[in-house]
Amino acid sequence: MFRTEISTTPHQHLITHQDSILTMGSCFADVMGNRLAENKFSVDINPFGTVYNPVSIFKLLSQAASNTSFTNEGIVESQGIYQHFDLHSKFGKGTKEELQAEVQQLEQKTTKTLADAKWLIVTLGTAVVYERSGEIVANCHKVSASQFSKRILSVKEVIRAYENVRNQLFQVNSGIQMIVTVSPVRHVKDTLVVNSQSKSILRVAVAEMTAFPEVSYFPSYEVMMDDLRDYRFYEKDMIHPNETAHDYIWEKFSGAYFDEPTRQLILKWQKLKRNLEHKPFHPASAHHQAFLKKTMEEMEQLSSQLNLEQEIQALKKEIL
């Protein structure tokens, strides 16, 4: 043995293609959300953009659950663009009114998504937070650092932030299941020492959160740190896990949250997906046209279990 493998056991509740899923949190929530979407799950991926600290994540969930509007005090103008301290930088408009309109639409959409979701996947990135006028912000939007104070959350603060939103979640969706993971992305900007402290706080907090019956923990952080445990599984920046690592973590996630029929369905779709990605030298040839027709038959058979309408319509255009 030259490594220590982390084994995952099937969760009490399992994800199916009939379930609606919402992911929120750090950029690893995007990674997991995109993997789910690629495999034909119904998923809304980080509707508020990437948010790294748990207080801001749970605040956004609270606002979505209660359909509470964002405060205008959080709006800031920087370099001619209006943004909100609770949201990712991608939400920016030329006027305050345009931003308010966009935020209102975002709130309404996410409130409905949360109400319909069977699963909420939350990825916590860091316990390091920035405060402005006593309020923790999700994003500083390149505003002068002099306007913020920086500190590290305590375990109690993280747990309290979830407790504050928990009742609201159940009021809007009594059957929701929550998967929490600590992001394996390293926050080296705050130094590796602080990153280690930050991840430890998040990990202890999540361990206590799993006392709530709706919360389960998926060990993506441990898989990266203690199972893969090698720089060849990182991107060139030595901060983000690479595609090989994502594949491996996804495999572990599948073992924990998908049953065997769901995994087999994913394998069938992946085979068809590779067929669709095939680029022939001679698209009009009899051989390729036969290949397309066979692929179409297989897709139509699978369409009773997965939503393949878009792919079927695109494939029809290629068949002569």
Put a short name on every predicted segment.
Residues T113, V158-M178, A205-S216, A256:
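A structural motif corresponding to the C-terminal end of an alpha-helix
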Residues G125-A127, N167-S196, Y221, D227, ...:
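Active-site segments of SGNH/GDSL-like serine hydrolases
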Residues V31, S42-V122, T126-E131:
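Conserved SGNH/GDSL esterase-like catalytic core that processes O-acyl groups on lipids
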Residues R132-V155:
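A solvent-exposed, charged loop/short amphipathic helix patch at secondary-structure junctions
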Residues K252-L320:
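Conserved catalytic region of serine esterases and O-acyltransferases that act on ester linkages
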Residues V143-K150, S198-F212, H240-E243:
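Acidic, His- and aromatic-enriched active-site or binding-groove loops in soluble protein domains
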Residues M1-G74, A205-E208:
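Serine-esterase "nucleophile elbow" of acetyl-processing enzymes
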Residues Q177-I179, S200-D230, K252, I266-L267:
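Extracellular serine-dependent O-acyl
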